Regions:
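Membrane-helix and juxtamembrane interface regions of eukaryotic multi-pass membrane proteins
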Residues: 1-151
Length: 151
């Protein structure tokens, strides 16, 4: 059941709302890219590839989306943070761009976790652990105003 936006804002606050929306859009965009790749592009481009190659190629194509968007948001957000004030740099409140960058990254990691669980070729405990810990701790640290520069 999808929760209405006013309920999310009232319950979680504006920062969590921005992060949750970015997470949701990123997860959905990754799924749409997967469907487009599998349905339209892969049959033409990768028709003569092995099943293993197709899994890795599919994963690589979908991962281009966050790889080409999240760093630009994160770098732009970095310029808005008070990094010159060493006393408050690691406890700074996240900017909307930082919230979007974290949400975008975590949304993709949630998608990639599902993809890894569905395909044994990319199912590795370290990769799954990296994704799950990031999905848990990146939003937590960001919303608690802790170590945003590290996230």
């Amino acid at each position: 059941m999808l929760l209405p936006l006013p309920y999310i804002q009232e319950t979680l606050g504006d920062e969590a709302t921005i992060l949750f929306q970015s997470f949701s859009w990123s997860f959905a965009a990754s799924c749409v890219l997967l469907v487009l790749w599998r349905g339209l592009i892969a049959p033409v481009v990768a028709a003569n590839r092995s099943a293993d190659d197709l899994v890795f190629l599919t994963n690589s194509v979908v991962s281009l989306f966050p790889a080409l968007t999240a760093p630009f948001l994160a770098v732009q957000a970095l310029w808005e943070l008070p990094i010159s004030d060493h006393a408050t740099a690691l406890a700074a409140a996240p900017t909307p761009l930082a919230l979007r960058a974290v949400g975008l990254s975590c949304g993709y990691m949630a998608y990639d976790t599902v993809f890894c669980l569905a395909h044994k070729q990319v199912r590795h405990p370290l990769l799954l652990g990296h994704h799950l810990l990031s999905i848990l701790f990146f939003p937590y640290a960001t919303l608690r105003h802790r170590a945003l520069l590290v996230v």
